[in-house]
């Protein structure tokens, strides 16, 4: 990450202290002395920096004697580059540049402590920047549809870039399908685990067929994914948009192992679909002799 320190010769010692801190975290640091007042040099530095620190007597303003600093501050704030300002005068006054990306301090010590606390945030921001650039260079759009495509294709490296770039794990593709459902439909267990670790909604419902992730896994007859989602607390009582309970769907797939684990974790074999038929009724209709006693035991 690239840092720009804008300061005065009289504040050189304080600037060096902060520079040492930044370098210790593997940052690249440019230092510009306002005593030079070289607008061209400062402009080039602002183009390359990811963060900026101002160490001066006051905040940059039209009233001070350094017009290039006013330009730099305006440019950085306009580009939403985090701006950290240490001023020894007017410390109790409101900070005129205050925005979400601007931070004011009354001392170098305050700044140093805050930077130390914020470094995990800076590193995460740097990781996102790198990942987004990598996607851009590869010609990959940074959007949910593209993420869903790479989940389906099992492109692990690209999926990792989307996650590192800060994609919302609860986002949906153009059809309204949550990423977790996309992963379940394509038997991507590792991706399901990753998405849940990152906070994906385990019971998110798709807008196409109205299935939850565990319903998609049952539909695909993938026991490993069903077992994982069940153990993670997936809702087993949900009824799909077309009126199918989870266990009715499971009976339709004919996967006895899936039916058994669903019942063992509380799925109700008496819950009826839109036709008024329960999982037990379908088991009897289709002569699923191994499932009938399992379901009937739940009535007792």
Predicted regions and their residues:
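Conserved N-terminal substructure of TIR/SEFIR domains
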Residues: 1-49
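C-terminal interaction surface of TIR/SEFIR-family domains
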Residues: 17, 93-160, 164
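Conserved TIR/SEFIR loop-to-helix hotspot centered on a Trp-containing motif
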Residues: 59-78
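Ankyrin-repeat-protein effector appendages
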Residues: 128-146, 265, 274-275, 282-300
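Ankyrin-repeat boundary/"N-cap" motif
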Residues: 139-149, 172-179, 205-213, 239-245, ...
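Ankyrin repeat A-helix N-terminal signature
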Residues: 149-154, 182-188, 216-222, 249-255, ...
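Conserved ankyrin/ankyrin-like repeat signature
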Residues: 158, 190-191, 224-225, 257-258, ...
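Ankyrin repeat domain, specifically the short helix-to-loop turn at the C-terminus of the second helix
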Residues: 163-168, 193-201, 227-235, 261-268, ...
């Amino acid at each position: 990450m690239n840092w720009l320190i804008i300061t005065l010769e009289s504040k050189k010692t304080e600037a060096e202290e902060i520079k040492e801190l930044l370098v210790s975290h593997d940052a690249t640091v440019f230092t510009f002395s306002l005593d030079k007042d070289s607008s061209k040099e400062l402009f080039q530095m602002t183009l390359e920096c990811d963060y900026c620190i101002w160490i001066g007597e006051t905040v940059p303003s039209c009233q001070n004697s350094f017009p290039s600093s006013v330009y730099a501050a305006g440019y950085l704030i306009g580009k939403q580059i985090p701006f950290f300002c240490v001023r020894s005068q007017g410390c109790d006054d409101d900070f005129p540049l205050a925005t979400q990306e601007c931070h004011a301090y009354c001392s170098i010590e305050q700044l140093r402590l805050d930077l130390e606390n914020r470094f995990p945030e800076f590193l995460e921001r740097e990781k996102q920047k790198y990942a987004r650039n990598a996607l851009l260079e590869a010609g990959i759009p940074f959007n949910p549809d593209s993420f869903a495509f790479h989940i389906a294709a099992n492109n692990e490296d690209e999926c990792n870039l989307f996650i590192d770039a800060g994609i919302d794990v609860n986002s949906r593709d153009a059809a309204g399908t949550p990423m977790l459902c996309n992963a379940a439909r394509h038997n991507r267990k590792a991706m399901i685990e990753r998405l849940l670790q990152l906070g994906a909604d385990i019971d998110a419902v798709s807008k196409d067929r109205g299935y939850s992730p565990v319903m998609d896994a049952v539909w695909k007859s993938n026991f490993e994914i069903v077992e994982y989602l069940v153990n993670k607390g997936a809702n087993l009582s949900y009824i799909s948009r077309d009126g199918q309970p989870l266990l009715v769907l499971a009976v339709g797939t004919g996967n006895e192992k899936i039916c058994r684990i669903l019942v063992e974790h509380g799925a109700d074999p008496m819950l009826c679909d839109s036709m008024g038929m329960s999982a037990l009724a379908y088991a009897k209709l289709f002569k699923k002799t191994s499932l009938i006693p399992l379901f009937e035991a739940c009535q007792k």
